[in-house]
Structure formats: C-alpha cells, structure tokens
Amino acid sequence: MMDKQLIFSEIESMIFDIETAIKSLANSREYIAEDDYSRAFNKLAEIEIELQTLAGRVAYIKSSL
C-alpha cells in the first residue's frame, strides 16, 4: 500500500505530465493546420504512449488504495 504522501507526489507528477500532453496536442493541431501530417502523426503517436503510461500509473494508484 502506498502512503498518502507518495500518492500525492505521484498525482502531482501525473498532473504535470497531463499538462505536457495537452501542450503536445496543441502542437499537433498546429502541424495539421500547416499540412505537416507526418510530424502530427508522430507527435500523436508519442502522446498515445504517454497517455497509456499515465493510465498504468492511475491503475497502480487505484490498486494501492
């Protein structure tokens, strides 16, 4: 079982990672607007991996509660 401080720290870290992913999504929209689909596709693939990692971290926290 994770202690409360560790859970809090992990949630803070996850919030930072979510904010970073949101900025990356904005970049992807810009690439699409510029018809740079290859770059947008690559950025979206990176975001997908980041979101899968976040989902795993959420599942770990939930299992520790």
Which role fits each region the language model picked out?
Residues 12-65:
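Short, charge-rich amphipathic interface segments used for partner binding and complex assembly
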Residues 1-16:
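Short, charge/polar-rich alpha-helical segments
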